[in-house]
A protein has these predicted regions:
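Expand to "…catalyze enediolate/carbanion chemistry for C-C bond making/breaking, isomerization
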Residues: 1-109
Length: 109
């Protein structure tokens, strides 16, 4: 189990931030600032799917877990960010149990 996951399960206080600038240097600077995690905001920024992996790797350089807020409920977007190495996925606008089940199902492959 990753330290990030363990800390979340143990409900430890973590400090993180959202990142919407689609450049690896911006992610590296933010990660180097000492945050416990980053959330790359794919939903509200103009980031290509190809760039997501670069941003996750930039956070990895500083051993900072990077979650990604995906643009919607599409299973292929959820799978893509996990394939790219995201430490977690934030799925927006989940309003029903069925949507939650579908999002969880998309993480299992």
């Amino acid at each position: 189990m990753s330290d990030f996951r363990r800390n979340c399960i143990e409900q430890k206080l973590l400090v993180g931030t959202f990142a919407a600038i689609p450049h690896p240097v911006a992610i590296e600077v933010t990660a180097a600032a000492g945050v416990d995690f980053l959330c790359i905001d794919w939903e509200h920024s103009q980031i290509s799917r190809e760039r997501i992996e670069d941003l996750i790797r930039a956070a990895d350089v500083h051993r900072v877990p990077a979650m990604v807020r995906v643009p919607g409920h599409a299973a292929e977007d959820i799978a893509a960010v996990l394939d790219a190495g995201a430490a977690g996925v934030l799925v927006p606008r989940v309003s029903t149990a069925e949507q939650a089940r579908a999002a969880v199902k998309a993480t299992r492959y």
